[in-house]
């Protein structure tokens, strides 16, 4: 499998995992009756079955009949699932969720989900029984890779934060007491200059303290530190060895940034694109910049479900751009006269009625599926790459808000 094909496969699998995790996270049990089991790849299935059998036996001591029955039913369902596996679980292990969830009106529904081969290996065996499924370890596996420290400063203010994968996270800020260059009456120029230099030095120490508090404990996980601001501020700060000595070697570079508030952290990431060339957020921005450039020429760009789908079917889409935050379904309607039409609806909403635009007849629902999976299936058949775009930068937000979360960069202009 080529690297692009492998990346597309990994992205799709991550999306499918994320979708299931979001569903599981919303489930609640009426008591402590939702069971989660994390199984590493080197744990023998027979050992897990023995553990589940033991838990089933111990559950007979639960006083509440409802909870006792629910827990034992969940464990029985898990044992049934484990019968489908040989000696060991799949690569990277697996996670099984089972339990009676609250369906409202005093009713419950029994659900069992199995997630095989997560993006990262399951580190240890874990049995968990609570009123909610344990999804946090899986959520951590899906976090974007790459961890960078961010510092922006001038002589008025400073902000410190993280770049985690595609997300810029402001964490700490400070305002300086550095006086302006004009001295107050009665002060000698020499005394004023000395006081000003002391204030600058104190402020740099404060900024370094914020950075040290945030970054030192994470220094072994850090991929680098980026420093931004106007000259000579950022130069003085770095040349003055204010940062902790173990952080100084992590500095990837200094970059000119016009703003030093929270928005300056995003500007810093933009301006450090060469240093971050292999990071996902830079790739996202490159795709969106190309999309907007093509859109402004009126040629090799498409957006929205209908136009993008038509171009996908034609095989003209080079890259399908999907917002990571898109949560919609596509409903396929068919009228009595055989006309087929599509409508995109929020995944949380019920299926609306539909009148055929061609003949006016009431149309029946033929199918409803996740809009991303629908489009990705066509893309795979046509050799189109799919890119998931973060909303943690302006053009990524625009993809979701202005274009419905769906767009494409075309191989050639189609007029569609």
UniProtKB/Swiss-Prot annotation:
Compartment list: Cytoplasm
Q: What GO molecular functions are on record for this protein?
A: translation release factor activity, codon specific
Return the InterPro entries for the record.
Answer: eFR1_2_sf (IPR042226), eRF1_1_Pelota (IPR005140), eRF1_1_sf (IPR024049), eRF1_2 (IPR005141), eRF1_3 (IPR005142), Peptide_chain-rel_aRF1 (IPR020918), Peptide_chain-rel_eRF1/aRF1 (IPR004403), Ribosomal_eL30-like_sf (IPR029064)
Primary localisation category: cytoplasm
Question: Where is it found, in Gene Ontology cellular component terms?
Answer: cytoplasm
Q: Which domain of life is it from?
A: Archaea
Q: What Pfam family does this protein match (any one)? A: eRF1_3
The answer to keyword Protein biosynthesis applying to this record is: yes
Ordered alphabetically, the record's keywords are: Cytoplasm, Protein biosynthesis
Q: Which family does it belong to?
A: Belongs to the eukaryotic release factor 1 family.
Task: Quote the function comment for this protein.
Answer: Directs the termination of nascent peptide synthesis (translation) in response to the termination codons UAA, UAG and UGA.
Q: How does it assemble?
A: Heterodimer of two subunits, one of which binds GTP.
**Can you name this protein?**
Peptide chain release factor subunit 1
Recorded source organism is: Halorubrum lacusprofundi (strain ATCC 49239 / DSM 5036 / JCM 8891 / ACAM 34)
Give the taxonomic lineage as stored in the record. Answer: Archaea, Methanobacteriati, Methanobacteriota, Stenosarchaea group, Halobacteria
